[in-house]
Regions:
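Cytosolic regulatory protein-protein interaction regions
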Residues: 5-150, 155-174, 178
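Intrinsically disordered, low-complexity regulatory regions with latent secondary structure
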Residues: 175-221
Length: 221
C-alpha cells in the first residue's frame, strides 16, 4: 500500500483557488464541486486500507467522521451549484451529475468496506447505484458530455457482474466519439477485473488490485 501512495496536493481537494479565471468550470463541465469530492473519498479509502493493514477491522472514528462529512457534502449538492455557461444543456448536466453522484456513493461504500469481501447486502447497495449510473450514461450516448463519464463508468463497471452489461460498457469505451487511448486502456483494465475469479476482484478495491497485479499505470477523473 505504501508503495502506491503518493503525497497529497491539497489543491485537488478544493478547486476554489481557480475560481477567478474566466475558464473556471470548463474542465469539469461546471461540476467541480462533485469532482473535488473524488480525491477526498480516495483519502478515506486509503485510511481504511491502512487501518486494516494494522489489524483494525472496524472503521475508526476518524474514518467515520470523514465519510459522513463527504457524504453530507455529496447529498447537499444540487445541479444549481454547477458553474454553467449558456451553451450547457441543463438536462444533460442533470444526467451527468447524477452519474457522478451515484458513482461517488459506490466509492464511499467501498471505502468503508476497505479490503473486505462485500456481503450480499453491500453488493445490492452497489447495484442500485450502478443501475442509475448506466441509466444516466445511456441518455448521453455519443454526446460531448461522455468526456466527463470516464470515472463514473470505471467505478460502476467494477461492480458490474452481468455479462451483457460488461460487453456494452466495453464497447462504449472502445467506440468513444473521442477515440482516446485511455478509453481503450480503461476497457482493458475492466476486462482484467471481470475475468479474474478472485472474489476480491470486485468494485473499486478490485480495480486497485487489478492495477497492482498487472502493474498498470492508470489514473483518471
Amino acid at each position: 500500500l505504501t508503495e502506491r501512495t503518493f503525497p497529497l496536493d491539497h489543491f485537488i481537494t478544493s478547486l476554489d483557488s481557480l475560481s477567478h479565471y474566466q475558464t473556471f468550470g470548463i474542465m469539469f463541465a461546471g461540476l467541480h464541486g462533485l469532482f473535488e469530492l473524488i480525491p477526498q473519498a480516495s483519502l478515506l479509502f486509503g485510511q481504511r486500507l491502512t487501518e486494516q493493514e494494522a489489524g483494525v477491522d472496524d472503521p475508526s472514528s476518524g474514518c467515520i467522521e470523514l465519510h459522513d462529512t463527504i457524504q453530507s457534502r455529496l447529498r447537499d449538492w444540487n445541479v444549481s451549484q454547477a458553474t454553467t455557461d449558456s451553451f450547457h444543456d441543463k438536462d444533460s448536466m442533470t444526467h451527468v451529475s447524477k452519474a457522478i453522484r451515484h458513482s461517488l456513493e459506490i466509492y464511499l461504500l467501498a471505502a468503508m468496506q476497505g479490503s473486505s469481501i462485500p456481503n450480499a447486502e453491500t453488493v445490492a447497495q452497489f447495484q442500485s447505484h450502478v443501475d442509475i449510473v448506466f441509466g444516466s450514461g445511456q441518455k448521453l450516448h455519443q454526446s460531448q458530455w461522455t468526456a466527463t463519464l470516464m470515472w463514473p463508468f470505471l467505478i460502476a463497471g467494477s461492480c458490474t457482474t452481468q455479462q451483457d452489461r460488461q460487453q456494452s460498457l466495453s464497447q462504449t469505451l472502445r467506440n468513444s466519439r473521442y477515440r482516446m487511448k485511455h478509453s481503450i486502456r480503461a476497457s482493458n483494465l475492466l476486462q482484467r477485473l471481470w475475468d479474474d475469479p478472485d472474489p476480491l476482484m470486485y468494485g473499486p478495491y478490485g480495480l486497485y488490485l487489478a492495477i497492482s497485479k498487472h502493474d498498470i499505470t492508470f489514473g483518471t477523473l
